[in-house]
């Protein structure tokens, strides 16, 4: 079976219906990015806002994005006779469980998990990034019954060992490899930001 991966091609029920009609074996919906939700909230915040107003704005944007994504799942399920796989990309542990529960309730056939965290701490412990994959998988498996698929990046030092541990802890499948947005640095604010990403030949891809 040919599975259509998460992209702009899978961000509407109409596009997904056409992909199913053309022979796709399954469809992975356009990923829901937690950091994108947070970025939009930050861009709309005003320094003059009270803390309560900023919190309300962030929660409003979060709920709006989640509602749109759940609607995409439901509408795609109505028009597609093939499996519809949701995809989430988060960087805080607290959000994974809430996202996963709502996605299962919306009717997704499976859930793809993307994990990305910039390791900038001086006291970083080797192996903690790999362990984070396992811990998040365990937490999600305790709360939902649909298959959980782990999507891995290409910068792991020992992907075979990690994949073995993911299967041992209940992963239904593993996707190789994810191409994350490349981080950049705002030299004026000295902050991490997401870099631009364009279609280029494989030889021009940058490594993290």
Predicted feature descriptions by range:
Residues 1-169, 175-201:
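Active-site entrance/lid segments in N-terminal catalytic domains of soluble metabolic enzymes
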Residues 203-208:
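Conserved small/polar residues in nucleotide/adenosyl-binding loops
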